Regions:
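Short loop/turn motifs at secondary-structure junctions and domain boundaries
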Residues: 54-60
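A short, well-structured alpha-helix characteristic of acyl/acetyltransferase catalytic modules
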Residues: 1-50
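Acyl-donor (CoA/ACP) binding surface of acyl/acetyltransferases
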Residues: 2-23, 63, 68-149
């Protein structure tokens, strides 16, 4: 009998595109996901399309989709990119609940942080999280973020 070995998932991030809007709306409207997110629920496709259109060409933010083995599974990005002061705000939200806890967020975050510190030449990345969002806090500590306040 052949034994099948588990291989690690291939994780990548890519720029958020118009085609990703329905998935983002689905993920955010899922009660398992939106407890720690700051959105007016239910999120609507039309409102999200307007958000997307209003952000085209902006250089002060970078919105991306996380893919694991080619399947979209969450969003990640940088907000308030301030090149003058070399800083930005980081965010991440895993949408596919069945893929949580598999290390995808860690891998995607490392890719994004490499981009932020390498290509964008930033020297400070910060974030905000809810006090009760312990899984996210563990991820952020693992990535080297330091708790303030």
């Amino acid at each position: 009998m052949a034994r099948e070995e588990k291989r690690p998932m291939i994780v990548r991030i890519r720029k958020f595109e118009r085609k990703d809007i329905p998935k983002k709306v689905e993920w955010i409207n899922n009660p398992q996901n939106n407890k720690s997110l700051h959105y007016d629920i239910p999120l609507e496709v039309e409102k999200t399309q307007k958000w997307f259109d209003s952000n085209i060409g902006r250089t002060d933010r970078y919105d991306a989709v996380i893919e694991a083995d080619g399947v979209p599974c969450g969003t990640i990005g940088l907000l308030e990119i301030d090149k003058k002061n070399s800083k930005a705000e980081y965010y991440i939200a895993m949408g596919e609940t069945s893929l949580k806890g598999k290390g995808i967020s860690t891998q995607a975050s490392k890719i994004l942080l490499d981009y932020a510190f390498g290509e964008l030449k930033l020297n400070r990345i910060y974030l905000y999280t809810e006090t009760e969002n312990i899984p996210a806090q563990r991820l952020f500590e693992k990535l080297g973020f330091i708790k303030e306040g």
